[in-house]
Amino acid sequence: MIKVVNVEDREEGNKKAHDILKKLVENKTLLALSGGTSVDYRVTLGQNEIDPGAICVVDERFGKPFHQDSNELLLKNQGVKDFADRFCIESHKILKGKDFLETAKVYEKEIEDLFKKFKKKVGVMGIGVNLHTAGIFPYSVSAKSPNFVEAETVEDTFPKRITLTLKALGEFMNFVILAFGKEKKDSLKKVLDEKENDMQKNPAIFYRKSTIKSFLITDVLL
């Protein structure tokens, strides 16, 4: 279930995301954060108006902790770590210096425990031009896995991924999705197209087909 929220540009979109998150997130909420180019957490999280019970990372590009292409470094550079430390919010990142499969196994246990602890779960998400979301790529294991977390190699510039699965996303209460730029237009049209129903081919149509309320914030006219 998607509500489209039209904005002028990325800056306005992140401010709108902040306003929506203020209404959705409270201290008994697990807030899951994605990487990507659309979100600016310095704006989206703001200074002190959003107070989740815990923060976790939706997906990661595998490597050493805080490697230069990691989502966790992006989040750190955008102030998420400082935000969590300042307000004593527990935070959970993926990379811990273990091998590929062991990293996923450890994070799976963390996510299972977080899902038991927090009934309310809200995700900040993105959508790729190939309709991937999180680290769930077309025809990937994570699109059909019975687990909450998967490690797999996908066709991408950063192939080794650890990600929440579609099954895990199905546990959420709300999503705030940010997608900007004319290159996303065809992809977003597919997400909203009632004739597109293959989530293995186009994982991001999950947001339309699911009963979970999602807010799609975009500068693209659809």
Stretches found by the model and what they are:
Residues 1, 51-124:
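Ligand-binding beta-strand-loop-alpha-helix segment within the catalytic cores
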Residues 1-31, 118:
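N-terminal glycine-/serine-/threonine-rich phosphate-binding loop
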Residues 27-48:
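Glycine-rich N-terminal segment of FAD-binding domains in flavoprotein oxidoreductases
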Residues 32-38, 125-129, 180:
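Glycine-rich beta-strand-to-loop/alpha-helix junction loops that act as flexible
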Residues 41-52, 138-146, 194:
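A glycine- and small-aliphatic-rich helix-loop capping segment at beta-alpha/alpha-beta transitions
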Residues 104, 133-139, 187-191:
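A short secondary-structure junction signal
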Residues 123-167:
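Class I SAM-dependent methyltransferase SAM-binding "motif I" and its flanking Rossmann-like core
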Residues 173-222:
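ATP/nucleoside-binding phosphotransfer catalytic cores, i.e., glycine-rich phosphate-binding loops
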